[in-house]
Amino acid sequence: MSTDKITFLLNWQPTPYHIPIFLAQTKGYFKEQGLDMAILEPTNPSDVTELIGSGKVDMGLKAMIHTLAAKARGFPVTSVASLLDEPFTGVLYLKGSGITEDFQSLKGKKIGYVGEFGKIQIDELTKHYGMKPEDYTAVRCGMNVAKYIIEGKIDAGIGIECMQQVELEEYLAKQGRPASDAKMLRIDKLACLGCCCFCTVLYICNDEFLKKNPEKVRKFLKAIKKATDYVLADPVKAWKEYIDFKPRLNNDLSYKQYQRCYAYFSSSLYNVHRDWKKVTGYGKRLAILPPDYVSNYTNEYLSWPEPEEVSDPLEAQRLMAIHQEKCRQEGTFKRLALPA
């Protein structure tokens, strides 16, 4: 039986940063574009690119490094837009765990990772810092990295600042400890990448679906842009509408995660060319991409002007770190104004 319904698979259970997708649905923005969307949740986040690439699902969300690796492994997907730009990603741990800013302090520790590429990243870093993969114990945690740290199942684990780190900070607050005891060894700094773009969360499409339905994809992105604009213009009102639809997120932790995600939302939705070049090179360095791999992204389905890329990405990252720390302390919704 055929259907005009477009299937869209999230990268995880509904989270604060999924708000533009659900508001585009609940506020009727998809309907305005003549689209009938089915928003789906994965039981296993690692299945997302395979399900989309095999054509079982039309569209979805995935991080940049996974999107690149998917196509290299024979799952034809293409990024058509960005949702969350360069969230800080790294090895999270708690002060007092015996781990310090020295990467070698991870020797003998249990380190959690989401999926196989997380382990590949850690293994590559161990070589860079004079260690071997056998010097630590790898534990696959899925999306439960913060939970496993709190429960003592792992000593550290890969997570992102606006999600798992906030979860650790909330745990610390309940223990009467300072939130600053939640620490992160940022992978972009450890690996000398110059950006956290490998974990940029993207809107991706099955290539055959994209080829056959270019206008539907353009309309989808128009609806997403309208929802994103709405979120950025009035984040508090947008959140109230979101939790009315997703009451499970009506809690302090989710709200604080949303505040920390706010600065990372891509306002233009554009794929950033420089980021794709860097992460494609990183993927080749990790040997998950062949030497001749061509990046699988396009901006041709975005029907508004492309913004200029920041002139100094390293300075932008430095300023974002200061901005996010201020957001943690003050609990406000602010966007970072970058110098030209």
UniProtKB/Swiss-Prot annotation:
Coiled-coil ranges (or none): none
GO process annotations (BP): thiamine biosynthetic process; thiamine diphosphate biosynthetic process
Pfam family, one: NMT1
Cofactor (UniProt): Fe cation
E.C. designation(s): 2.-.-.-
Motif (CCCFC): 195-199
UniProt binding sites for pyridoxal 5'-phosphate: G115, E116, F117, G118
Biological pathway: Cofactor biosynthesis; thiamine diphosphate biosynthesis
Active site, renumbered: H66
Keyword Signal listed: no
MF terms (GO), sorted A to Z: 4-amino-5-hydroxymethyl-2-methylpyrimidine phosphate synthase activity from histidine and PLP; metal ion binding
SUPFAM superfamilies in the record: Periplasmic binding protein-like II
Reaction catalyzed: N(6)-(pyridoxal phosphate)-L-lysyl-[4-amino-5-hydroxymethyl-2-methylpyrimidine phosphate synthase] + L-histidyl-[4-amino-5-hydroxymethyl-2-methylpyrimidine phosphate synthase] + 2 Fe(3+) + 4 H2O = L-lysyl-[4-amino-5-hydroxymethyl-2-methylpyrimidine phosphate synthase] + (2S)-2-amino-5-hydroxy-4-oxopentanoyl-[4-amino-5-hydroxymethyl-2-methylpyrimidine phosphate synthase] + 4-amino-2-methyl-5-(phosphooxymethyl)pyrimidine + 3-oxopropanoate + 2 Fe(2+) + 2 H(+)
InterPro entries referenced in this protein's UniProt entry, alphabetically: NMT1/THI5, SsuA/THI5
Chain positions found as N6-(pyridoxal phosphate)lysine: K62
Top-rank EC class of the record's enzyme: transferase
Oligomer and partners: Homodimer.
Annotated function: Responsible for the formation of the pyrimidine heterocycle in the thiamine biosynthesis pathway. Catalyzes the formation of hydroxymethylpyrimidine phosphate (HMP-P) from histidine and pyridoxal phosphate (PLP). The protein uses PLP and the active site histidine to form HMP-P, generating an inactive enzyme. The enzyme can only undergo a single turnover, which suggests it is a suicide enzyme.
Family statement drawn from the similarity comment of this UniProt entry: Belongs to the NMT1/THI5 family.
Protein name per Swiss-Prot or TrEMBL: 4-amino-5-hydroxymethyl-2-methylpyrimidine phosphate synthase THI12
Lineage, uppermost ranks: Eukaryota, Fungi, Dikarya, Ascomycota, Saccharomycotina
